[in-house]
Amino acid sequence: MALDRTQPGLPMKKGRAGTMTHDYKRHGTTTLFAALNVLDGSVLGRCMQRHRHQEFIRFLNAIEANVPAGKIVHVILDNYAAHKQPKVLAWLARHPRFVFHFTPTSCSWLNAVETFFATLTKRRLKRGVFRSVVDLQAAINRYLDEANHDPKPFLWTAHPDKIIAAVNRGRQALESIH
């Protein structure tokens, strides 16, 4: 969200954290579509006005244009409705090198790109002041450029057995609800 505070916050001083007003003026939103190459850490990102199947297909086309021919592209997705829309599935049928994998409900942490989103939020967006969507998108694009200048491969720090156990606990919890 492009947010502007109604008043400037007080700066940090020795022994006191900086402050920020609770109220703000909202100047609009943007959607960041991002694809993380886990092997080298590079991120392909596109800011778009909305998050519908049309924008998602445009982003898939950007991935298609940026990944060398002949490589299989594994796309990890949440269960957002736009990802399963018939036109998206038709696009997928026409692009057999793309393979979609959907994370279980409430398991977005299994998607490595979520780590990138968290880092972007912490380092660039949190406590930021953006007086327009254009300012917000410029900040996101600068961060993408910086991150891609010296990318780092994504490495899981949790042991695979812990990850699988967490997924199984989540599945059991969901199945017990029904």
Outline where the language-model segments fall.
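Short, aromatic/basic amphipathic alpha-helical patches
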Residues: 85-95
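RNase H-like polynucleotidyl transferase catalytic core
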Residues: 16-24, 94-112, 128-130
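C-terminal domain-tail junction helix/linker
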Residues: 135-178
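Short glycine-/polar-rich loops that comprise or flank the Walker A/P-loop
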Residues: 40, 71-72, 95-99
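Active-site proximal helix-loop segment of RNase H-like, two-metal nucleases, encompassing DDE(D)
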Residues: 43, 113-135, 146-148
